[in-house]
Amino acid sequence: MSETTRRKLIEVALPLEAINRESAREKSIRHGHPSTLHLWWARRPLAAARAVLFAQLVDDPSARPDEFPTQAAQDAERKRLFEFIERLVVWENASDERLLAAAHEEILRSTGGNPPPILDPFAGGGSIPLEAQRLGLEAHASDLNPVAVLINKALIEIPPRYAGRPPVFPGTAHSVEGVAGHWPRATGLAEDVRRYGGWMRDEAERRIGHLYPLATLPDGREAKVIAWIWAR
């Protein structure tokens, strides 16, 4: 069977129950999920995007009769792929480097070692290009909405550019956060965001903090104001 007609797993079947369960569960995740950093109104579940990308690139066993000549062999291999996807869509496994590397190897095996780049021309909240990148694929995104463009720059363009690099904030490159000066993935960038964010807050307080006085409580104590309501 030629490469152009090879049937992909998504054309045959998917473990929809597991994908749906994890997609629904994402709504309650409040740590590390992009939705906690910014709002997008039609955000696609990361679990579904990850599963669909994997299944549309990996061959269905029926497309490889040389490796799986019988129906029983094809069913067994399809079951293995289903179980793999069921692990792949779990949120707690989203940063499992060994699992993601195994997913990438499965994709390479089905694409002759040369998987196609992934383009989402209306990327919105960035779920598809983000998950393509997580699976080790070349990802591209665009959108008509400038907010979506900014979101995708922050998700898939800037972090890879600075992956593995130490922070540039003075005095942090060899601090305790980096183990022996090693900053894996985008941890160096994240440290810079924390450090420069703190610096900007302190500088703003130094310059205009006097415009935001402490509130006097009924018992005479003073406390910081959590939110100001402006009225005319």
Residue ranges and their predicted role:
Residues M1-R232:
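S-adenosyl-L-methionine-dependent nucleic acid methyltransferase catalytic domains
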